[in-house]
């Protein structure tokens, strides 16, 4: 069995890790950094860029650059580039493909299996969409695990004794809080809560709005309507936010941000930490509710928690740390890297599934209640939130009208009392019920949640034994045909990327060969015949011409000819130099590494 990798597929950054020699290791990407921006771009020439290259060109190509796609997972949102529409699953798959390729380059072997993390508060549609993205990228997703749980695994791998731990996970786009009990290799989630639309992106937006509103007051121009100016504002806002984690004030300087009839306009302002905290205070305060909810669900008080772990880049913000300290009455633990802990935890779980680690048991929970719609549009819960998974529960229902021969099962997820206020996961019909007065038939509805948190539902008429079951595939999820089409397209992109890399390598080798040949002629030109020089110069020129074109095979062929000509001359010169150094040969005078000797010109054309 090959290596199973652990992937933190984040809103703004992603990270991949693997177990090596019993220790989790974060895998650097091809650019040399340990986290990869979750950014995909398409150049006007149709080339696809992922990660740092995509992020770098965002200012000049904002319309064709896709960021924070994770926020749209499990929805019917589509991104249109030229005439093609992309689903969030496809864009996420491109990020996963990049992480997979980096892992393969690091490990020196093919990678086909992964554990991928999701926010604890992701619903069924979002989890299924993540699994589909993995398949499109060519990965068998062995397990979907919750991000706070993964972070707790990273923290608790080498800890002894029983501890109650709270994980406060505030990333680029999502917020989760989970409470776990850790002891003797068992990681049991007691409760989880969160907000799928809160994170660093929202803090950036507050700075963007502050800058844009002030600029509009002064100049009467709304920069948010100019895509290129808005992208510059986004990058400046993120930079300012990061700097204010360590500095009390930062300067935002954006020359030539726009222009009007009176000339170019610039932004040059200072943002203090106090002002930034004022801008985001309500967002940070909104994390307090889920923390209290999780504590209440776990039946614990803040003083019962032994350690508070901060995960996600946004927890570096001093106001966030102060808020957590205020609620919990203790300093948060700083011993884990907030950007890498989730990927490390995923790698540990991957090693557990691969059989490399034997003494760890992970008991996670379902974040939201599951049930069905019953008479009057009421939501009847079958599995309560924070139930340990995997789990299977059944409940008996009956018909609402006389002689009813079929029932529609409407599956829902959420906490609201009315069906219409909860997330619809799908519907199916159980037919063939024998006619009977209402209230007589007995229909058993069974919910089954697997270890990935993905839901399977069945309904059975106890009188006839007829049953109907579905794995939830809501309206936003992809059909098998769509997934197969996307897998094939992803392979085409992979092939394009491979060819592009190959072309770059061939061009680099050709450049290097020209440099080597020219340097040799410069250093040893007085030892070469004019015919040899002419031959090499001719082949150098052929390679240069080939490099100007797009025919990779022509570059290869020209490089091979230059290589042959160069090799022939080099071999002769080295043999001659070696011969002159032998006793009994011509006595040359050694000058450093250059040997002078008499030699006879052999004309190859004779």
Curated annotation (Swiss-Prot):
Signal peptide: none annotated. CDD domains: ASKHA_NBD_HSP70_DnaK-like. The lineage of its organism: Bacteria, Bacillati, Bacillota, Clostridia, Thermoanaerobacterales. HAMAP family: DnaK. One of its GO terms (molecular function) is ATP-dependent protein folding chaperone. It holds the Pfam family HSP70. InterPro entries: ATPase_NBD (IPR043129), Chaperone_DnaK (IPR012725), Heat_shock_70_CS (IPR018181), HSP70_C_sf (IPR029048), HSP70_peptide-bd_sf (IPR029047), Hsp_70_fam (IPR013126). This is Chaperone protein DnaK. Belongs to the heat shock protein 70 family. Keywords: ATP-binding, Chaperone, Nucleotide-binding, Phosphoprotein, Stress response. Residues 576-606 are annotated as: Disordered. Residues 597-606 have a biased composition (Basic and acidic residues). Acts as a chaperone. Induction: By stress conditions e.g. heat shock. The modification Phosphothreonine is found at residue 174.
